[in-house]
Each structure stands twice: as structure tokens, then as C-alpha cells.
Amino acid sequence: MRKRFNVDGLCYPDEHYMVNINDRLEQIQTLIDDGKYFVINRARQYGKKTTLHMLAQKFSSEYQIFSISFEGLGNSSYKDEWSFCRKVYGLLYDVIYYEETSEVSDEIRTECYRMSLNDARPDFRTLSNFFSLICKESGKPVVFIIDEVDQAADQESFLDFLGMLRDKYMKRRSRPTFRSVILAGVYDIKNLKLKIRKGQESLYNSPWNIAAKFMVDMSFSPKDIAGMLTEYKDDINVAMDIDAIAQLIYDYTGGYPFLVSRICQLTEEAAAESSMQSVSAAPRLNEASGSRCYKWNKSDILDAVKQLLNEQNTLFDDMGKKLSDSKELDNIIRLILFNGKKIPYSPDEYAINLGVMFGYLKNEDGLVAVSNRIFETRLYNRYLSENITENKLADTASLGRNQFITDGILNMDLVMEKFMIHFTDIYGDSESSFLEEHGRRIFLIYLKQIINGVGNYYIEALATLNKHNLT
């Protein structure tokens, strides 16, 4: 079975085309060796699970690793201290039973199983002593990993559990405990506390203030993407300018792992489908090797971008939900996109911090910006579609769209000329405040109807509306 590009769940090096993350793993190992407790909080589908899995695989000979996940735990697991501790015992026993860790004595195995049973009543002190026993008996430093901590975001028992881990960290010089504890999820633990506490005075009173800052860059650089494409090119005999294609993918994705892999996946699928449906599009002969090969070029990547922007997936669905849940974040993005507002970047501003944490916003030269072209265009499409059915200008653009595009080139001068005529007819009597607030949005609705289905667009600044080429 040959390798594939993958966007669903874990990636395995022997099954999937992947970016080489050894340098990230070594940076994480440094944190572990230094005895740090930390949180890998990154946006959805940012490679957290794969990183944790490869971390456990790569360093299992140096550390005894217990890796559990709170994904899928029901509310009954958090209803009281006993229920929560029983569940943690159960998750630990699964790790032992399936031999995902080594060097576990019969005493620990038996005790772990006994405390996971429904009639057991373990509390946090019992669990803390059990952790100490594991660490005391282990011949290697013990690392404790908890994935999907967001699943416990609204549960007081989880924060009490963090408090117990903090207490063990503070007493690490006198009592056996973990070398390192790694939590993983979208939210920082400080934000988990914020979601639970209702009183403003305790919003940031997190028991996880012992955590070291996690500074590892998990996005993909053009060099990272090029390395993955090189492996693919060698395996499949694809003809492409690797550096140029890698840079183009990066330009649209900002190195967001899911977006990078999805564009590659869509490009590969389209090439395979095209070769099967059309003789003329079948793989051509590679003159150097004499074998048959595909070819990737700029238009293939842009077609994949267009397809990605038009599909429903869990990442975009989650984006819509997050924006619906946070009106402050939604308003900031609207101001940036449609008003061109320059908002100073401040990590202390809750809505900005939330947008960065979700992967939608970034700090660009001290100002808040949308993190990549894919997200920016998807957000434009989302907002522009809200009232498009009621917009008369959109109708006029749709009816006359053929006159604006010749051989893939957008006649921007004609677009502006016709727009001003129609805009004056429809909105000429509007107040200046309306025009200032909504003018850019109205123009983008007009422009979108013209290029819809013909090309892609992205907007770097208001001045870029003068560009003539469709991409």
C-alpha cells in the first residue's frame, strides 16, 4: 500500500506523506529533560495528536510515558471526585493493558484495575499517592500526557485535578513525581479557568500557573512543505517545481497543517481523476526516466484552493460556530476585513487572544491580521453571502459578468466604471456614514459575483483591488 496525504486523525510516517517534525520533537524533549510542565495549545487540526503520538514513539526508550485522552468522556465522569478519579484510573489501566507503556509491576497493574471499578471510591489523595508509586518504582523518568483537555473545560473536578498535579510539582524535590506533565488542547489552561468561573475576580486564577511557555512553532514552513513534496515526487514520479509549489501552498495557508495537507490531497485526487477520465490528461512520459508521471503546476494548486474554499469540513464548521459564539471576535474580524481598521495587537485583549488561539488571527507587525489567505477568503465569502440575495448590485454584476473577463484576465477598469454607475444609481442618495461603513463590502459583493466560478481572489489591502489578474 503506497502512502497518501492525510487529513483525518493521526498521521503515520509509514502510511502518510508528512512534514519531518524531528526538530519539533527535539525541542519538546528539551522541555521534558528540564522537568517542565507545559500545555501544547494550538488550533484545531494543527497536528497535536500526531506530535504526541510520535513523541511517545520516539522517546519510549528514555522515558516511561503514560498518554491518555479525555476525548469522549461523558458528564458522569466529572459528577464528583470519586467518579473522576475512577475514570483516570481506568484510562491509565488501558495504557497498561494494551502495553502502551512498559515496566509496570503487578502491584501497580492490580491496584490500577481495582480503583477503576464502579464500586471503588478513590479520591485525589489516593490518586496522588498512586502517581508517586508509579514514579518511585519506574526505572526511567515518567512523563504524563493528557490530550483533549478542552473536553474537561467546564468541569470543576478537572481543575481540582490540575491543582493536585500542581501540588506534586511543588513538592518534587522531596517526593517522587513526574519528570514532566504535558497537556494538549486548543485552549490554554488559563482560558479553561475563564470558561468556568463566573466572577471577574477569579478569571485568571488558574492552578496551572506552574506551566512553562510552549514556544515550539508547529506550523509548516515552505522548507517543511518542500520536504514532504520531495518525498511524494520521488515516490509517484510527479513533475513539479518543488520550491515554487511549496511556496505557493504556504502563501495561501500560512503553514496551517490541515490546510497544507488538504490542498496536497485535493491536488493529487484531481490529477488521478483527470488521468482516468481523459486520455489527453493521462500521465505523460518522463523523458529522463522513461516512466509515466503526473505534473503539478500553479493552476492545479489554485484549483485545489478553490475546491477547498467551497467545501464543508470540520475546520470551517468549527470556525462558523466559534464566530457565532463570540460576537467580540466576529466584530474584530469584520472591522479588519470591511473597514480596513488597523487594530493594535494586544495579547491581553480577550477577543484577540481567542482569535489567535483558534488560529484565525495573527500578530503582523504589531497589528491584528487574519492568519492566512484561505481563512481570509472563507471569511469574506461567509460575510458577503449574508445579504447577497438582497443586493441589487450583485444582480447587475451577475447579469453582465461575461463582459468583464477575457482569456482569464479581469478588466478592472471596466469593472470600476460599471460599478460606479450602478452604485450611484442605487446608493447615490445614501448618507456618507453609510458609504464609509458599507462601501467596501458592497464593492466586494459586486466583484465576487463577477469572478465567482472563474478564479480565486484574496485581498491584501484596499489598494490591491486595482490588480488586474485573476488567480
Model-inferred region functions:
Residues S221-S278, G290-F358, E364-D365, L393-N402:
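Winged-helix-like regulatory helical subdomains adjacent to P-loop NTPase cores
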Residues E376-F404:
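Short, amphipathic alpha-helical interaction segments positioned at domain boundaries
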Residues F66, Y78-V104:
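Conserved NTP-binding/hydrolysis module of P-loop NTPases
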Residues S60-N75:
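Conserved catalytic segments around the Walker B and adjacent sensor/switch elements
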Residues M1-N20, R109-C112, S206-I210, S398-N402, ...:
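Conserved adenine-nucleotide phosphate-binding loops and their immediately adjacent elements
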Residues Y446-T471:
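Active-site metal-binding core of divalent-cation-utilizing nuclease and nuclease-like domains
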Residues M1-F59, N129-L133:
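Walker A/P-loop-proximal flanking segment of P-loop NTPase domains
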Residues L117-D188, I196-S202:
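Conserved Walker B catalytic segment
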